[in-house]
Amino acid sequence: LNNLFGEITWFYPTQSSEIVNRSVTYNYMESSSQRPIWTTGSLARTTWVDSSVFGLPHGTSYNATGTSYDVVGNTEGATTYYQHETGTDQVKSSATTTVAANIESGDYDITQGQQGGADIRGDGEFIMKIRRFVPDFLSQSGNTQITLNLRDYPNSSQASSSLGPFTITSSTTKVDTRARGRSVSLKVANTGSAQDWKLGGFRLDIQPDGRR
């Protein structure tokens, strides 16, 4: 439990691992019955204590390069103790490591109606042209990377906009993209140290486009 952000996390080992190496999180604070919010990740913690005990969450993880033990049946290693929700990077043994993270939306397409007569719609049939987007962060430290992933068909591989990925600073007002496709998804990521962001409501300038 992380009551600072309304999250419940389960840490577990994957089928090929003997130790915890993955996690799945449910956000009960921002979820609804129609839109539950789940996230998955590689955060591995063997123990966890919520912020209600020490003021901030604390956890431990298995470290395979730690001390050896001459005990038959035990796995060699040691435990690393972490304090969470402080700063933007991982600090371990005086070394600072970037916490790379990203979030990506589902595919979005446009539905075009017909003027007069029957309302004939082709859901996902029309090519869209994305001229620009307006980034919106409720808070931002450092730079943030935005990628527009495009598809022409559901089974096609994703392709980034030819001008992307785009680097967003705290002073960026708009970004021209010249992207086109039947569907698009938005990926937001931090890739360097001292980067942090809280996503707001992005706006994309979209219009129907020809097939050629």
Feature-to-residue mapping (PLM):
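Beta-sheet repeat architectures centered on beta-propellers
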Residues: 1-212
